[in-house]
């Protein structure tokens, strides 16, 4: 999940998939969003966001500063950002909450022909590498 700030200071959550995020190294990520989306507009305006990664026992909040990149020639509708990791907060169930686990979560179901879906995801990953 990606949380950006709208112009009024309210958090705006958005779902992102693994295909839209590419780790460049330990401190930099590349993010691809639909160019006309609210999250891309918010990130361009504020330059800050928080990525949330959660599994059964751990939740990580990755605070990032984002810089808009030029569009990829192969993906004109894609807004690309380079994200620099500013801080990482880890959250585990401890104390009275010890043993509590996230039992289920958000799952993206890529519908359609599997070959077409794989091609689309590969295209997106390639555009992030440009």
What is each PLM-predicted segment?
Residues 1-130:
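Binding-site signature for planar aromatic cofactors or substrates
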């Amino acid at each position: 999940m990606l949380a950006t700030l709208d112009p009024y200071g309210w958090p705006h959550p958005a779902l992102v998939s693994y295909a839209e995020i590419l780790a460049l190294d330990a401190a930099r990520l590349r993010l691809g969003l639909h160019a006309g989306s609210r999250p891309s507009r918010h990130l361009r305006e504020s330059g800050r966001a928080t990525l949330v990664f959660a599994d059964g026992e751990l939740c990580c909040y990755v605070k990032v500063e984002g810089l808009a990149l030029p569009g990829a020639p192969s993906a004109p509708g894609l807004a690309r950002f380079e994200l620099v990791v500013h801080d990482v907060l880890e959250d585990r169930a401890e104390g009275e909450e010890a043993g509590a686990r996230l039992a289920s979560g958000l799952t993206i179901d890529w519908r359609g022909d599997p070959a077409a879906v794989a091609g689309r995801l590969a295209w997106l990953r390639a555009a992030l590498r440009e």
